[in-house]
Regions:
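Cytosolic-side transmembrane helix boundary signature
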Residues: 1-15
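Class I S-adenosylmethionine
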Residues: 3, 17-138, 212-217
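Class I S-adenosylmethionine-dependent transferase superfamily signal
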Residues: 113, 188-190, 221
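S-adenosyl-L-methionine
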Residues: 132-160, 165-168, 172-174
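A short glycine-rich, Lys/Arg-flanked "PGG" loop and its adjoining helix->strand segment in the class I
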Residues: 181-195
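Conserved beta-strand signature within the Rossmann-like core of class I S-adenosyl-L-methionine
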Residues: 196-203
C-alpha cells in the first residue's frame, strides 16, 4: 500500500511514499539454498549470495531461505513484484528528471526506471561491491548508470545533490539497518529531495498492527515529512 506524507513545515511540498513489499507471499520467494538452477553461489563481506536462473527471469537471493533481493526479466516488462509499485513514484513527483537509488542491488529499480522513464538521470549507491559485480555479470545492469560502493547514509552526508525521486531499498529481507531508519536519516533524505520530490521506502515485512516495525517506521517518517 501507499502512504503519502507531505511536509507542512517547509516551503516546498515533499511527498513521501511508503510501500510494503508483498514478495514474501509470492511463489517466487520460497527460496531454499538447495534449489537447482544456480548460476552463482558465494559470499561477500556482507551477504551469502545466490544467483538463480528461472525460465523468465534471473533472481538474486541473500542470506536467508526465502526472499528475492533483485530480479531481472529476460523479456522486458513488469516483474509482478513490488518493484512495479515503486514505478508510481516518478508519476507522483512534480518532476521526473532524476532519481537516487540507495540500495542499488543488481539494478532492478534502475532497469525499470530506464524502461518507463528513459530520459531520467539515475544514480545508484550500493554498499556491497560483490552485488555490483554480479549485476554486471548476470543482471544486465545499465552501463550508463553510475554506482558508488558506499553506505547510503554516509553517501548522503557527503553529497550536495538533489533529486526528484529517492528510492530507499536498503532494507534487506527482514532486517533494517538502524542508521537508515532514524529521524536523522530521513531528514537527510528530505534535504536531498527537490521541491515536489518523492521518497519511496521498501519495507520487506507484512505487519501493520499496533507496535509493528511498519508502524514505528511510519511514525518516524511522519515526524520528518509531516502527517498531512
Amino acid at each position: 500500500y501507499f502512504i503519502s506524507i507531505k511536509a507542512k513545515r517547509i516551503a516546498c511540498v515533499v511527498s513521501a511514499v511508503i510501500f510494503v513489499a508483498t514478495s514474501c507471499v509470492s511463489p517466487l520467494t520460497g527460496f531454499a539454498f538447495w534449489e537447482t538452477n544456480l548460476a552463482y553461489e558465494g559470499e561477500s563481506i556482507y551477504n551469502y549470495l545466490q544467483v538463480k536462473n528461472l525460465s523468465d527471469r534471473t533472481i538474486l537471493s541473500t542470506n536467508v531461505l526465502f526472499g528475492v533481493q533483485s530480479v531481472t526479466m529476460k523479456d522486458k516488462g513488469l516483474t509482478g513484484m513490488y518493484y512495479d509499485t515503486a514505478l508510481a513514484a516518478p508519476a507522483l513527483a512534480d518532476n521526473a528528471n532524476s532519481a537516487l537509488i540507495l540500495g542499488m542491488g543488481t539494478g532492478t529499480y534502475a532497469r525499470q526506471l530506464k524502461q518507463y522513464y528513459p530520459k531520467m538521470n539515475i544514480t545508484g549507491v550500493e554498499i556491497d561491491q560483490k552485488i555490483t559485480d554480479l549485476a554486471g555479470e548476470y543482471f544486465d545492469e545499465p552501463a550508463d548508470i553510475p554506482v558508488t560502493t558506499y553506505d547510503g547514509r554516509a553517501w548522503l552526508a557527503a553529497s550536495h545533490d538533489k533529486y526528484d525521486v529517492i528510492m530507499v531499498d536498503a532494507y534487506q529481507d527482514i532486517t533494517i539497518p538502524f542508521q537508515m531508519s532514524s529521524t536523522e536519516f530521513f531528514t537527510m533524505v528530505r534535504e536531498h529531495l527537490n521541491p515536489g520530490g518523492v521518497m519511496v521506502v521498501n519495507m520487506n515485512m507484512i505487519s501493520d498492527g499496533q507496535g509493528s516495525i511498519n508502524e514505528a517506521l511510519s511514525d518516524t517518517i511522519a515526524s520528518v515529512f509531516g502527517n498531512g
